[in-house]
Amino acid sequence: MQLVQLLPPGVSLLALVWLAVDAAFLTALLLYLQRGCDSGRSLLCSVFQDLIRYGKTKSGLRRPSWLQWFDIPKRCFWHFYFVSLVWNGFLLWILLHLLLQSVPVPEWLQAVLQFLCAGSEPQVLGGELSVVLAFSLLWLHSLRRLLECLFVSIFSNGVIHFVQYCFGLGYYILIGFTILGYCPLDRRTAVSLDDLLMQGNWYHILGLTLYVWASLHQYTCHCILADLRKSASGAIINLKHAVPTGDWFEKVSCPHYFAELLIYLSIAVVFGLLNTIWWLVVLYVLLSQALAAVLCHEFYHEKFDSYPIHRKAFIPLIF
């Protein structure tokens, strides 16, 4: 607890962690856009390029052979969503038992949240429905992405860095703490399901609508990418890359990344736009997906001479 006491008033350790993550990805994005650390310039630049790339954007990259020791198959992406499904499902189960049956939160979990969230904004009373919905949307998103990784996506032999893999696992654990930390956990009386539903507001409907819309488009885009490697009968015929077309691909190179941002924005809306720390999560998603989209956009332009020049990388008409 001494570490928390050293933090500025009103700032939690959790907020500082997200700020540090945001700063790291902003630095990486700006450094890449300024071409300040091209691969091969130095050993440090080679490591930098290896850390920011994954999958197809690593192909053709000049890499020291020893960096391949840290390669993990990209098809292991499903591990992230499995961890999120189990962990955040567990936290949602604890939250529902607290709210509906007054079952106390385990002491170890209270201690962790106290350590991470001490000094943060006051927890919002009457916002339990927002927290339940946020957890539910995150859990459903993890379930859908897990099923897509296992049954829709067709992975090539692309790789991710071991650091990226570890970060991805930790990310979904930290997300759970971030959502749960927004709800008061010291309540002594249960609420009924009707009480929760009475908290419903316009922003819950708006957030759910945005979530469904973005999720449908993301699923469609993942199906389009998978179909590029299938025959008309559905058989896998190659693992090559091709120019995707249809749906939001007509506007941007990486619409599935744009949809990911909208999904996290929808959860911010479900919180009534009031969860400050969640906005730091949204900022991370914006920066990380922007970096990945720029790398992917450049890959398409370098590989395909006839690639549509009107497409943006990430956000339609903007970036």
Curated annotation (Swiss-Prot):
Key word Metal-binding present: no
Reaction equations catalysed: a di-trans,poly-cis-dolichal + NADP(+) = a di-trans,poly-cis-polyprenal + NADPH + H(+); a 3-oxo-5alpha-steroid + NADP(+) = a 3-oxo-Delta(4)-steroid + NADPH + H(+); androst-4-ene-3,17-dione + NADPH + H(+) = 5alpha-androstan-3,17-dione + NADP(+); 17beta-hydroxy-5alpha-androstan-3-one + NADP(+) = testosterone + NADPH + H(+)
Q: Which UniProt keywords apply?
A: Endoplasmic reticulum, Lipid metabolism, Membrane, NADP, Oxidoreductase, Transmembrane, Transmembrane helix
- This enzyme's EC code(s): 1.3.1.94, 1.3.1.22
**What membrane topology is given?**
Multi-pass membrane protein
Gene Ontology CC terms, in alphabetical order: endoplasmic reticulum; endoplasmic reticulum membrane
Q: Which residues lie on this side of the membrane: Lumenal?
A: 34-79, 144-158, 217-266
Show the InterPro entries listed in the entry.
3-oxo-5_a-steroid_4-DH_C, Dfg10/SRD5A3
List the stretches on the Cytoplasmic face of the membrane: 1-12, 101-122, 180-195, 288-319
The residues that cross the membrane are: 13-33, 80-100, 123-143, 159-179, 196-216, 267-287
The places in or outside the cell where this protein is found are: Endoplasmic reticulum membrane
UniProt pathway: Protein modification; protein glycosylation
Q: Which BP terms from GO are recorded?
A: dolichol biosynthetic process; dolichol metabolic process; dolichol-linked oligosaccharide biosynthetic process; polyprenol catabolic process
- Which GO molecular function terms does the record list? 3-oxo-5-alpha-steroid 4-dehydrogenase (NADP+) activity; oxidoreductase activity, acting on the CH-CH group of donors, NAD or NADP as acceptor; polyprenal reductase activity; polyprenol reductase activity
- Pfam families with a match to the protein in the record: Steroid_dh (PF02544)
What family, per the record? Answer: Belongs to the steroid 5-alpha reductase family. Polyprenal reductase subfamily.
Q: What role is this protein assigned?
A: Plays a key role in early steps of protein N-linked glycosylation by being involved in the conversion of polyprenol into dolichol. Acts as a polyprenal reductase that mediates the reduction of polyprenal into dolichal in a NADP-dependent mechanism. Dolichols are required for the synthesis of dolichol-linked monosaccharides and the oligosaccharide precursor used for N-glycosylation. Also able to convert testosterone (T) into 5-alpha-dihydrotestosterone (DHT).
Q: What is this protein called?
A: Polyprenal reductase
Organism, scientific name = Xenopus laevis
